[in-house]
Every structure is written in C-alpha cells, then in structure tokens.
Amino acid sequence: MEVECLSEPAEIAIARTANPRAFAPRLLFPDDCLFRREERGIGVMDGMARRDTRTFFDRSVCPETNFYIGEVVHQPGKWSSFPPHTHVEPELYYYKFLPENGFALAEYGDDAYKVKHNDLLGMSANVTHAQACTPGYAEFYLWCIRLQDDKPLVSTFVPEYEWVNDPDARFFPNEK
C-alpha cells in the first residue's frame, strides 16, 4: 500500500494482527465509520465523564476484521472510560495532548500511570482501565482492540463503581 500525504505534518497509525480471512485492503472514509461522533458521559456524573468518541470500525461494518478501533477526544479535567471496565481482549491507547505538555492518569488494574503526549499504553486481557485528564489540557487517544476470532467484545464495568452511571446518583451527602 502506498500513502501520499497532502498536508504537512501528517501522522499515520498502523495496527496489524494475524487474520485467517482473505480480503482486499481498503481505505475507510469518514462516512464509512461506524459512528462519526458519539457524545458520552452526558447526563451522568454531573458531566465529569464527558467525552466525544468516534468508532472507526468493528465487525458490524467490516465483517472480516479482527480489530475494533476508534478515538476519544477527552475533555480537560474529566474522566474517560469511567466507571472502570475490563474485557478479555488486549487494548492499546496512543495519546496526544493539547497543549503538548499535558498529561493524564491511566488506571491499569491497581496501578496508575502518568501518560504524556505520544505515549503508548498497552492493556493486557482482563485488566481494569479508566482515564483522568488534567485540567486545562485536552486529551486525545486512539484505541485499538484486537478482537477474539469470531467472538463479540464484551466489556464489564467494575460493579462497585457502576452506581455512578445512575442519572439520579448523588455525589455529596447534602446535594439537592
């Protein structure tokens, strides 16, 4: 495959994996994507998990794929992928920040990592994960999940934190 970039600078992410299915490569355009833009976290947690998600593709639009790939534009000072969740598939996050000196904290099981501009974080199977971005900095991350052969992705929230998704949840004892 040959790519001609028409802008300066340009970045390309390449994800590769084994796939027993035979199929021709193809270029997906924005209109081919599963969701062009999905606002998540609205109406729960007082908006503290507000983010925009764009899912590029999964098996519903590319039946031959072994990937589920998309991106998140994460609001400054807010959480993403909260409550923490897990799945049996491994996942990669590739980070960008604006301004570039920003950072976020990435939960990885019982640990947290400071992730910065151009960092890559790999999540092993069945490891809980969520993100918290610093105030004043916008975070972008590209996510890539290697799907199991012929099995759907099943994400599971950590039960002890799932209550925060209730639109009527109260976060402070005297909150009205």
Listing of model-derived features with the role each one plays in the protein:
Residues 46-92:
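A short glycine-rich, His/Asp/Glu-containing loop-to-beta-strand
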Residues 64-65, 90, 99-103, 137-139:
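Coil-to-beta-strand transition motifs
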Residues 12-14, 69-73, 92-94, 112, ...:
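Conserved hydrophobic/aromatic beta-strand scaffold that supports enzyme active sites
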Residues 4, 80-87, 106, 113, ...:
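Short histidine-centered beta-strand/loop micro-motifs
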Residues 8-51, 107, 142-176:
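Double-stranded beta-helix
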Residues 93-117:
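A short beta-strand-loop-beta hairpin characteristic of the jelly-roll/cupin
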Residues 5-7, 14-19, 55-59, 71-76, ...:
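Short, structured patches in soluble enzyme cores that scaffold and shape functional sites
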Residues 1-6, 17, 114-136, 142-146:
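Conserved metal-binding segment of the jelly-roll/cupin
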